[in-house]
Amino acid sequence: MSSTEYAYAVANVRARESELLDNRFFNQLLSGTSFEEAKRMLIDKGFSEFENTSDISAALKNYMEETWEYLQEITPDKNVLDFLVVKNDFHNLKALTKGIMTDTDGIKYCLKPCLINAENILNAVKNKNFSDLPSWISECAKEGYGLLSSSMDGQLFDMFVDKCSLEAMQKLAADDFSKKLADSFTALTDIKIALRMARAGVNEMLYDYALCECDRVDISELKSAALKGYGNVVSYIEETEFSELAEYAAVSAAEFEKNSENYILALLDNARRISFGAEPLIAYYAAREAECRNLRIAVSAVHIGLPAAAAKERMRELYV
């Protein structure tokens, strides 16, 4: 599809960018003296859901779903954005499979937007009709079910499905920018996992369940470094294109994770400046996702009386 076919969609997103919350607003939100004051600020910004509830999750439930529906309406090629939300389908697969195993309701833990109706995943797994699911998730659903039913190890199951999620994201990434973004995200996730596993001194087998192949890191070398210790992973990072993040990894895995997300947002910040193509739409969705995450942190902080400085340490950069 020609990039010029995105001209209308890009112009539409440009107009919407002015509605994104900026750092100034978040500073005001965190400086509020009460949860009720924070709610009023959000209601004034258009978050009418806060008028009827103090449940942060409930109020923000439709936040990203509305963003997704809007982008689907204006995007010439509906599939080009699929790689952005496929992680929710794998989250839903985890919730539903565990629900089946424990005879509990997994549906209530499912996320939207997603590519597959959660009920369809539930029926496929419950009836073991895994082939009813799209190819990018069917084998994972089958193997994951077998893994969980035989081991009843929820952590191992989570690792396996999360790896499958990264593989699917790379598979569904359609254009050069999407492929770069998906591969970079996978590489940074692999490094984050290696840092945490190295610190914990986990069994070597777990690395094979957790690390996902990608172009920007060699997972065999990363695994080898992690097995030698945390500091060796930091040294490995210094030899990759993510060398600028090594100093944060030296502080902690959490500090690396925060700054790796900011690294991805920097890629997206450059992408949104492109005049034609899907890149600005991808960047807009990611910006809304970062905004949503920061909202949860900020509103929760005000609700429980967490100091603003502590909340800001957990928040991610915004591109507005």
Regions found by a protein language model. Give the residues of each.
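N-terminal domain-start signal
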Residues: 1-320
